[in-house]
Amino acid sequence: MGKQKIIDARKAYYEGDIEKSKEIHSHYHNLDKHAEHHSLDKDHLKTIIFGSLDGIITIFAIVSGCVGANITPAQVIIIGVGNLFANAISMGFSEYTSSTAQIDFMLAERQREEWEIENCPTEEKQEMIDIYINKYKFDSKDAKNLVEITFRNKHFFLEHMMSEELGLILTNEDKSEAFKKGILMFLSFCFFGMIPLFSYVLYNLFFSAENYTSSFAVVFISTLITLFILGLFKSQFTTQKPIVCALSMVLNGSIAGMLPFLFGVLLKTNSGD
């Protein structure tokens, strides 16, 4: 429900429709008592999108370079599959280790802040007062009143202080969540990385492998179509307009595919083979 609300609200914003925006907020307020759920599992979404884009562009670049060099289809497939799984494993493991490091750091900072709030409450309050005055331009009296009110709820004060002082948003993530993100990265990289490779294999099943420019065109078109769709999907969770986001993905993919292909052709020509 929260996810759909954000999508509807953004659509109203892009259209500049104030009445529609009010209607959406009122509708979802009655459904969930205004629990907006802005996160949308954003960490999972970020992992999937990053893995998908990295997978398809990385393998597209590898296949393009191989096709440009006009090596045999069997060699292209071997190189492509090898790089696909090697990169997917590397990306998945990197996502897992970075997530666990972030969780460990956040928990350590939380424990430190909890200890300071318990043992040095006056100093902790003063830190927040200074933040309200210097960052948000509250006067001293209002800043002190805000701190006294928020300090009554220690959990809220802790979360708010970590956000303002350290730039950390407390979550309920644990090591199992980090493992899940690593798996998501691996799977999304593999799935979308297979698209340029699979389109190349399909072309060579039905057409001559000697026409490497045609095989590149098939890989190029299938990849850009996929990137366009991924861009449209990504736009639902960003501030970019759908067509702008989609075209930026296409431009990125075009450059990433054309350069290796041209270098492959150049190297093949200079080698004299």
Curated annotation (Swiss-Prot):
Binding sites annotated in the UniProt record for Fe cation 3: E116, E124, E127
Catalytic reactions of this protein: Fe(2+)(in) = Fe(2+)(out)
S-S bridge residues: none
Pfam families named among the record's database cross-references: VIT1
Keyword Plastid carried by entry: no
Phenotype of gene-disrupted mutants: Non-essential during asexual blood stages. Parasites yield lower levels of parasitemia and liver infection. Moderate reduction in size of developing exoerythrocytic parasite forms. Increased labile iron pools in blood stages. Increased sensitivity to iron overload in liver stages. Decreased sensitivity to iron chelating conditions in liver stages. No significant defects during transmission to or development within Anopheles stephensi mosquitoes.
Main location: membrane
Lipid bilayer topology: Multi-pass membrane protein
Binding site for Fe cation 1: E113, E116, E124, E127, E165
Classification via CDD domains: Nodulin-21_like_3
GO biological process: intracellular manganese ion homeostasis; iron ion transport
Keyword annotations: Endoplasmic reticulum, Ion transport, Iron, Iron transport, Membrane, Metal-binding, Phosphoprotein, Transmembrane, Transmembrane helix, Transport, Vacuole
Positions that bind Fe cation 2: E113, E124, E127, M161
Sample GO molecular function, one term: metal ion binding
Transmembrane segments: 48-68, 73-93, 182-202, 213-233, 247-267
Location in the cell: Vacuole membrane; Endoplasmic reticulum membrane
Residues in the Cytoplasmic compartment per record: 1-47, 94-181, 234-246
Keyword DNA-binding included in the entry's annotation: no
GO cellular component, one term: endoplasmic reticulum membrane
Residue spans, topological domain Vacuolar: 69-72, 203-212, 268-273
Subunit relationships: Monomer.
Protein family: Belongs to the CCC1 family.
Function in brief: Vacuolar iron transporter involved in the transfer of iron ions from the cytosol to the vacuole for intracellular iron storage. Involved in detoxification of excess iron. The transport mechanism is not well defined and the role of protons is not clear.
Name of this protein: Vacuolar iron transporter
